[in-house]
A protein has these predicted regions:
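N-terminal amphipathic/basic leader segments beginning at the initiator methionine
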Residues: 1-25, 29-30
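N-terminal cofactor/phosphate-binding cores enriched in small/glycine residues
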Residues: 21-26, 30-32, 39-54, 67
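A structural signal for small-residue-enriched, beta-sheet-centric alpha/beta enzyme cores
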Residues: 40-41, 120-130
Length: 138
């Protein structure tokens, strides 16, 4: 299966809906390293901003263009540590997809590695980054 720009756009929009609808449950999971209970809220606000920005992308847009738009939207909308980390992950993913019209499984895995690496470089205690690293390995 290949991932087109339209598929990535729709996935981000759906992810924003899912995170928003489950933000209280995610907040309740937030106990380490700081138990402030706002991870779900911050991630929801962050990805909702990216979702708003990526909605205008046409079905013909490349996966590279959509990923770049998402990365920019996440960065501009980043809230809290989790939002910043999410934006860093996607900045790396965007770099990994740069120049591609579509992405196959190998390209997605490589992009996830870029995302994980990008975020790890910026975070001192990368607890939530383990998921991205594990996904890239799969």
């Amino acid at each position: 299966m290949t991932i087109t720009g339209a598929i990535l756009r729709n996935a981000v929009i759906y992810a924003a809906q899912l995170i928003t609808s489950h933000r209280q449950e995610i907040d309740a999971l937030n106990v380490f390293p700081v138990p402030d209970g706002d991870t779900g809220t911050n991630m929801s606000m962050t990805i909702t901003n990216a979702s708003r920005e990526v909605r205008v992308k046409d079905d013909s847009e490349s996966v590279s263009a959509v990923a770049s738009c998402v990365a920019s939207g996440l960065l501009r909308g980043a809230r809290g540590n989790s939002g910043v980390i999410l934006s860093l992950i996607f900045r790396g993913i965007s770099k990994g997809l740069k120049g591609l019209d579509e992405a196959d499984g190998a390209a997605i895995a490589s992009a996830l590695e870029h995302g994980s690496s990008s975020a790890y470089k910026a975070v001192m205690k990368p607890t939530c980054l383990l998921y991205t690293s594990d996904a890239a390995d799969e």
